[in-house]
């Protein structure tokens, strides 16, 4: 594993800390290491939730390492499994990821956060996609994911001028789930992770799959799709032991014992 990453396992929760002074920027080597970490998380049946954060309190991540770019690393370089930062194109990851944004999330750092399922940020955090000012575009998901969240006028402002969005503005627009003080950030992310662990893992996988694949469909189209047999996890939920265990545990007034099948 790369020196730029710290991995910590707390039972079913994996914490990934990006640690590349001074700005937690991501070059191809670091991106490959992050991809390996997220693939390991995906494939480990004992891990249920991941938290991605940055070291320090100033930068979550400044995105692509411009020093590496100046030394010849191309914008379309191979950034490894899962795309840039290991998560932006990891479309078959059906476990939840929480981005604990501890500071500036710029460029690919913002795109990394957008690829997570939940974003909790410190109150001093800010978000920006300044790529146009560098002669490139935010093509690691920013220009694709942000329009699904924000109105066109706000998107255009951010991607074409590089305007920064504050934590409170991000909360108001629904870009982040919650804003907390810096010293509460990791505790808040861990508490959310513990809440997610209480949900059945197969049901969570099905929910990620359904929301991802039906996002641009009408309700009627979505109904047809989830009943078409095209999904992997939704039919499995309907015939799973967990689907029996949940109601039984509720009736018996005890915590359910999820098996994931």
UniProtKB/Swiss-Prot annotation:
Q: Which GO terms describe its molecular function?
A: hydro-lyase activity; L-carnitine CoA-transferase activity
Q: Name one GO biological process term.
A: carnitine metabolic process
**Please, which domain of life does this record's source organism belong to?**
Bacteria
Which stretches are transmembrane?
none
Q: What's a Pfam family this protein contains?
A: ECH_1
The reaction(s) annotated as catalysed by this protein in its Swiss-Prot or TrEMBL entry are: (R)-carnitinyl-CoA = crotonobetainyl-CoA + H2O
Q: Active site at which residues? A: 111 (nucleophile), 131 (proton acceptor)
Q: What class of enzyme is it?
A: lyase
UniProt EC number = 4.2.1.149
The pathway this protein participates in, as annotated, is: Amine and polyamine metabolism; carnitine metabolism
Gene3D superfamilies per the record?
2-enoyl-CoA Hydratase, Chain A, domain 1, Lyase 2-enoyl-coa Hydratase, Chain A, domain 2
> Which InterPro entries does the record cross-reference, listed alphabetically?
Carnitinyl_CoA_dehydratase, ClpP/crotonase-like_dom_sf, Enoyl-CoA_hyd/isom_CS, Enoyl-CoA_hydra/iso, Enoyl-CoA_hydra_C
Lyase in keyword set = yes
Record keywords, A-Z? Lyase
Q: Its biological function?
A: Catalyzes the reversible dehydration of L-carnitinyl-CoA to crotonobetainyl-CoA.
- Listed PANTHER family: ENOYL-COA HYDRATASE, MITOCHONDRIAL, ENOYL-COA HYDRATASE-RELATED
Q: Which family does it belong to?
A: Belongs to the enoyl-CoA hydratase/isomerase family.
Kindly provide the name given to this protein in its UniProt entry: Carnitinyl-CoA dehydratase
**Taxonomic source organism:** Salmonella arizonae (strain ATCC BAA-731 / CDC346-86 / RSK2980)
